[in-house]
Amino acid sequence: MGRIVAIDYGEKRTGFAISDPLKMIVSSFVTVLSRKAVMYLKNCTENYDIELFVLGEPRQMDYTPSENMPRVEKFKRNLRRVIPSIDVQMVDERFTSVLAHRIMIEGGVKKIKRQDKGLVDRLSAAILLQTYLEFLRK
């Protein structure tokens, strides 16, 4: 059984989360510079049995595309070109950053650590993946 990788793509940084092979457990994985994200994922496919990429779809509250949508769509095209054997599913990413901050506050994470944008990106990717896996179980 393959793993699923969630991608929280941003203008500067991209956060990743990965499932276990049984798709039961989500782990916050790593944050990389966005310009290196596709090649990082290509390397991951050599070390992990990845069956699907779940990419956060940036939308406004009224479901219209956010200003990051063109960058995300370009990233998706590039990802499909470089790794054509793995499908890319778009998933609504609204509220993932808000939830990431809330989880850190409720978890007692100190303010200085909550300002680590890479941590927020990884946690947002983990929330995205957890939401996707819960959807699959329904």
Swiss-Prot record:
<dbReference type="InterPro" id="IPR006641">
    <property type="entry name" value="YqgF/RNaseH-like_dom"/>
</dbReference>
<protein>
    <recommendedName>
        <fullName>Putative pre-16S rRNA nuclease</fullName>
        <ecNumber>3.1.-.-</ecNumber>
    </recommendedName>
</protein>
<keyword id="KW-0690">Ribosome biogenesis</keyword>
<keyword id="KW-0963">Cytoplasm</keyword>
<keyword id="KW-0378">Hydrolase</keyword>
<dbReference type="Pfam" id="PF03652">
    <property type="entry name" value="RuvX"/>
</dbReference>
<dbReference type="GO" id="GO:0000967">
    <property type="term" value="P:rRNA 5'-end processing"/>
</dbReference>
<dbReference type="InterPro" id="IPR005227">
    <property type="entry name" value="YqgF"/>
</dbReference>
<dbReference type="InterPro" id="IPR037027">
    <property type="entry name" value="YqgF/RNaseH-like_dom_sf"/>
</dbReference>
<dbReference type="GO" id="GO:0004518">
    <property type="term" value="F:nuclease activity"/>
</dbReference>
<comment type="function">
    <text>Could be a nuclease involved in processing of the 5'-end of pre-16S rRNA.</text>
</comment>
<comment type="similarity">
    <text>Belongs to the YqgF nuclease family.</text>
</comment>
<dbReference type="InterPro" id="IPR012337">
    <property type="entry name" value="RNaseH-like_sf"/>
</dbReference>
<dbReference type="GO" id="GO:0005829">
    <property type="term" value="C:cytosol"/>
</dbReference>
<keyword id="KW-0540">Nuclease</keyword>
